[in-house]
Amino acid sequence: FYIGFRTPPEDSTGVAHIIEHTVLCGSEKYPVKDPFVELVKGSLNTFLNAMTYPEKTIYPIASCNARDFQNLMSVYMDAVFHPNIYKYKEIFRQEGWHYELEDKDAPVTINGVVYNEMKGAFSSPDDVLNRQILNSLFPDTTYANVSGGDPVHIPELSYEDYLDFHRRYYHPCNSYIYLYGDMDVAEKLDWMDREY
């Protein structure tokens, strides 16, 4: 199973990457803080991930166990269409970025899962060079932007713009879904139609 969305970034704030992380931080049907971690620990999955590309964000899963496969589909579908990001701003702050003060004499710093992940990515000279090449070759396209987020620009992303990006791109008519394997595809499609 795979659900993906066209998510072209208009800047380098990393909004698509931050949403990829945050939709997996609980949803309407699965209100636990981090269902992704729970799935990794308790599922029979053979593949479970989420990835942000320059023009799309994808959520693939695989399992040889039919019951587990259905459960994984349910968790991922609810995560992308009914995430807790609208209820809890803290999810955005934790996974995206926030200001932090260790003590009253320390400088204010920026922290966040995606922010720190991308600081690591930007520490590689090869990656910096490749990003500059894409920016030079395709200046007026989505490839000129850093879909994962540039640490310099990530703090420019507001909570409101982040939610607007989810509303704009995370709906069924902007998604592509595929199923592969030994299963009753009509049954899965009926379930998706009924539930989402």
Model-derived features: positions:
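Short pre-active-site segment immediately N-terminal to the catalytic Zn-binding motif
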Residues: 4-14
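Active-site His/Glu-centered metal-binding helix of metallohydrolases
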Residues: 15, 19-23
